[in-house]
A protein has these predicted regions:
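Residue-level recognition of conserved structural "scaffold" positions that shape functional pockets
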Residues: 68-69, 129, 145, 149, ...
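Short, surface-exposed loop or secondary-structure junction motifs
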Residues: 1-141
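Short, low-complexity, polar/charged sequence segments that are solvent-exposed and flexible
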Residues: 33-36, 112, 141-144, 153-155, ...
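Short, well-ordered beta-strand elements
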Residues: 135-136, 146-162
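Generic structural motif
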Residues: 126-128, 152, 164
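Short coil/turn residues that cap or connect secondary-structure elements
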Residues: 81, 142, 163-167
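Short, gly/Ser/Thr-rich active-site loops of penicillin-recognizing serine hydrolases
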Residues: 98-108, 131, 159-200
């Protein structure tokens, strides 16, 4: 917290359950259950208690942050806070280490424009319609988050949700299509596992 949150001005960020509870101002997690006997039907959203296990391993879903905090983090990882995250550190973090063929398949179900998935140190690298893209995403019970940026354009997006809706992951290709001037597809309207016609 002293090495990153404070110097980056991430005033609401913390890495423990106690700090989250003490803040009093945070979005409660929401879930919904699949209806019995239905493959595509779900019940209503309902609020649930937070799951304490996520804070036992801070690197695995144990950070609490507001959208303002995440905006500061996005500035840092895009090279605008070299006093905290020097360029050589970012280069090390973002250098691809392994190819991710399973990630290619998963992301193709979100948008076929995601290709060439690789894994760096905690970050995924893709080519989105040929444009370099760096991203990190994850979910825990009742929450989902995604941060992504186009390093050659110095533009990024942060998506935070107090649910694990699969539509959350479809916001990113919608944003990327707008930013890159690509033909628009209604990714949010697509069912899971389908791709829009003509978007190969």
């Amino acid at each position: 917290e002293m090495r990153l949150f404070a110097p980056l001005g991430m005033r609401n960020a913390s890495a423990d359950e106690e700090s989250l509870a003490a803040s009093g101002d945070w979005a409660r997690p929401h879930v919904r259950e699949r209806l019995k006997g239905e493959s595509d039907a779900y019940g209503p959203w309902r609020s649930v208690e937070i799951t304490p296990i996520y804070w036992r391993v801070p690197a695995a879903g144990g950070v609490n942050a507001s959208i303002s905090d995440m905006a500061q983090w996005l500035k840092a990882v895009t090279g605008h806070q070299p006093g905290v995250l020097p360029r050589e550190t970012l280069d090390l973090i973002f250098t691809p280490r392994v190819n991710s063929p399973a990630e290619n398949i998963r992301m193709r179900n979100v948008s076929p424009r995601f290709k060439a998935a690789q894994y760096a140190f905690g970050w995924r690298r893709y080519a989105y319609d040929g444009e370099p893209l760096i991203a990190h995403s994850g979910t825990v019970e009742g929450y989902g988050a995604q941060i992504a940026f186009l390093p050659e354009r110095d533009v990024g997006i942060i998506i935070l949700s107090n649910s694990r809706s699969k539509r959350l992951w479809r916001i990113l290709p919608t944003f990327l299509d707008i930013e890159l001037g690509l033909p628009r597809e209604d990714w949010l309207a697509l069912k899971e596992g389908t791709a829009a016609a003509g978007s190969k």
